[in-house]
Amino acid sequence: MSKVCQVTGKRPVTGNRVSHSNIKTKRRFEPNLHHHRFWVESEKRFVRLRVSSKGMRIIDKKGIDSVLADIRSRGNRV
């Protein structure tokens, strides 16, 4: 499974690991993803999403129904 947040679209980015002697090697910055079950009252069921911590805050703010509508409008099946 890809490491992409289903709410925000956050994905890994690349950067440099820098040693004490300033030698740079490539590394990946991974998003803080979690599999989380959300109760959807309108559908009377749980929905399991792969979301970042930022995505969880967005769901708390906007509500799960609004966020699911956005995800489904992008063509993703939930």
Curated annotation (Swiss-Prot):
This is Large ribosomal subunit protein bL28. It holds the Pfam family Ribosomal_L28. One of its GO terms (molecular function) is structural constituent of ribosome. Keywords: Ribonucleoprotein, Ribosomal protein. The lineage of its organism: Bacteria, Pseudomonadati, Pseudomonadota, Gammaproteobacteria, Oceanospirillales. It comes from the Bacteria. Belongs to the bacterial ribosomal protein bL28 family. GO terms for biological process: translation. The gene is rpmB. One of its GO terms (cellular component) is cytosolic large ribosomal subunit. InterPro entries: Ribosomal_bL28, Ribosomal_bL28/bL31-like_sf, Ribosomal_bL28_bact-type, Ribosomal_bL28_sf.
